[in-house]
Amino acid sequence: MNSTTPSIQDQYILASKVRSKLAKCVSVTTKNKDYNLRVLVGHANLLDKITENVETHNAATNALAGDPFSKGPENLSIEHIELSNANASKNDVGKEENAEKTIESEDYCDFYSSDEDPDADTLSSTDSEDDDDYEDYDFEYDYSGGDYNKKIDMYFSFHTAPNYQYLTHTNSHSEQTDELAESTPRYNALPATASTTEEEQDTETLDAVSLHSSAPIFRVLSRRVNGQEDDSENESSSDVDDGSVPLTRFHSCPITA
């Protein structure tokens, strides 16, 4: 035997050899009492181990080869009774739970069902809120705002000045346009004044323009057509007396202050 794990056939062969050796030892010991007992004990122990291994091997093979359902009728009946009792207990528990749920659902439906109150599903005139429904309750509202509004008033009275601009009446857009139309001067309208002479216009322009103003002063002499055109001395004296300058002398140069 070279393998460390011998097969069952090798174990049977080894067991037969051990038996034969033990038998020889027994016969020898009877003849020769000086025989070594250690050899006898060793063979006996080896035989015990071999037989134990063979028995475990046979038990394993029998368990695999046998039918696992091959049980006695008594054991099968006991197991069937136990399973039926367990299933019955589970069914009883499930029925009790279902019964409790149905009772709760019926109570819930009865509480909210409309059979007890026929007017529950219809909205009648009595269901609407009236003032009579609130007669039993006393509602008190504090419109003053308490101390909070007083503090706000005191703050604004100290930190702000009264502005009466927003208290006056504000005109509408049409009224404002009417007022603007009345206040603006009408430049295109002709004044209903009598026609003035050339001398009056000259005096008006001289009065309006002063020496301290920046506007240029133009003085243009107009030669009057008289009967005495040859009298140059009279013209010069009239120019000096009038305070004007002849047109031929400065060609209407502007005199600024």
Swiss-Prot record:
Instruction: Fetch the InterPro entries from UniProt.
Output: Ecm13-like
Q: Which UniProt keywords apply?
A: Cell wall biogenesis/degradation
Gene Ontology biological process terms in this record: cell wall organization
Compositional bias per record (Acidic residues), positions renumbered to this chain: 105-120, 127-140, 228-242
Q: Where is the composition biased (Basic and acidic residues)?
A: 92-104
Query: Which residue stretches belong to region Disordered?
Result: 88-140, 222-257
Chain's role? May be involved in cell wall organization and biogenesis.
Q: Could you tell me what this protein is called?
A: Protein ECM13
Species of origin reads Saccharomyces cerevisiae (strain ATCC 204508 / S288c) (Baker's yeast)
Q: What is the name of the gene encoding this protein? A: ECM13
